[in-house]
Amino acid sequence: MGHGGEGMSLEFTPTWVVAGVCTVIVAISLAVERLLHYFGTVLKKKKQKPLYEALQKVKEELMLLGFISLLLTVFQGLISKFCVKENVLMHMLPCSLDSRREAGASEHKNVTAKEHFQTFLPIVGTTRRLLAEHAAVQVGYCSEKGKVPLLSLEALHHLHIFIFVLAISHVTFCVLTVIFGSTRIHQWKKWEDSIADEKFDPETALRKRRVTHVHNHAFIKEHFLGIGKDSVILGWTQSFLKQFYDSVTKSDYVTLRLGFIMTHCKGNPKLNFHKYMMRALEDDFKQVVGISWYLWIFVVIFLLLNVNGWHTYFWIAFIPFALLLAVGTKLEHVIAQLAHEVAEKHVAIEGDLVVKPSDEHFWFSKPQIVLYLIHFILFQNAFEIAFFFWIWVTYGFDSCIMGQVRYIVPRLVIGVFIQVLCSYSTLPLYAIVSQMGSSFKKAIFEENVQVGLVGWAQKVKQKRDLKAAASNGDEGSSQAGPGPDSGSGSAPAAGPGAGFAGIQLSRVTRNNAGDTNNEITPDHNN
């Protein structure tokens, strides 16, 4: 039991060791599962359905990780016995062959961050020794054929850990972004409350009936008058700079809120726009928290391009940085376009300034593209940070994969900058500007009203299909009647949602692409 004791099989391992380790693993797993279940119960009690669905998305990601882990464990023996010629593995290496020889010569005397972590986590060192023993077996298997293993057990083990670190980092960064962003958005609640108070102020009501010059309005002064009035380039420059300071002002909030209400629910001027905006953001959050298939494709491409001398880690850090600046600039420019439309059409107005929301202000007339970009930005930034810490813990700070210090520091600075800017500027901007499209989202209704509307729409669709089928039948057959509850095709009473009677609907669109299934198209002709 001396030197080879660490390689003993389960047959010669004490039962108390097996039972103890099994107990710890099962206890930790059950604790995490119960904790997630508790969070789900709390969200249900508070009627936070979007956040509950986001939690379910996290559970799906954990299940996917478990399945990936199972596949790697089951097939690691088969993968390690897949042998190839040595010259096949001499191309597209993350580190040069000289670096590998230098690392092998100095491995026994260099103290790295990896060894520091192994001091506190002895199981890591034990795992590496066990992997070394298995690696010797697999190398012997392939050497008999004059070949080398395609992927060593140790490399497979490190890849296994990286996938877990990446997924956990992405979920963590998304949650932190939404928490910090929601904190910023909650500061706007005082503006919503002040608007509600002004409705009962006689002086405010009298002032709204006055005729005012458009260029004297604070919203127009901020977005139309100034350096961007007569130049497109200067206008975009102003939008670019504004995302770094006062990205959303009170005049922005008041004007955009009024434009939304007058366009989509004119009959309900008392709509709590702030509460609706928060519900819509929670709906969007469940789209962002997961790792979509196209993000996994990005991971594979990045792992493929991680070639020595290309400095892929350094250049890839600029992708989310550039995208984040572009998204923030575009969102600010949408607000500027709304101001330009009003200022160019009117000289003076009676009452409040009203803007006209439209999909035409967004890229390809699709506001949901912005959400996809934010999703990619958060994932790529999480990928960058996760990869850094994974390399640091696994191979050490001086690893050739880590790169030189002059490439490491800018990456970390950019990563922190992206996280802060996205949390406190871009996400709040998206929360309000995304409402400036041609459609409003189903979050405008309370949950019980949403269920009633969806049920009503399904019944209308079923009756329409039955009528279409009957009209295509024999001419002599009797036509299907409309039925007692389908006379006018009007929506049923929504009970607590009767306050939304001012919202006129022509149809409820439920598409399969992206987050458009959250949108309801209003009828502007009524």
Swiss-Prot record:
Cell location: Cell membrane
Organism: Arabidopsis thaliana (Mouse-ear cress)
Effect of residue 456 to R: Disturbs binding to calmodulin
InterPro entries: Mlo
Gene behind this protein: MLO1
One Gene Ontology cellular component: plasma membrane
Ranges where the record places region Disordered: 471-526
Name the record gives this protein: MLO-like protein 1
Extracellular side: 1-11, 83-160, 394-412
Keyword set includes Thylakoid: no
PANTHER family reported in the protein's UniProt record: MLO-LIKE PROTEIN 1 (PTHR31942:SF52)
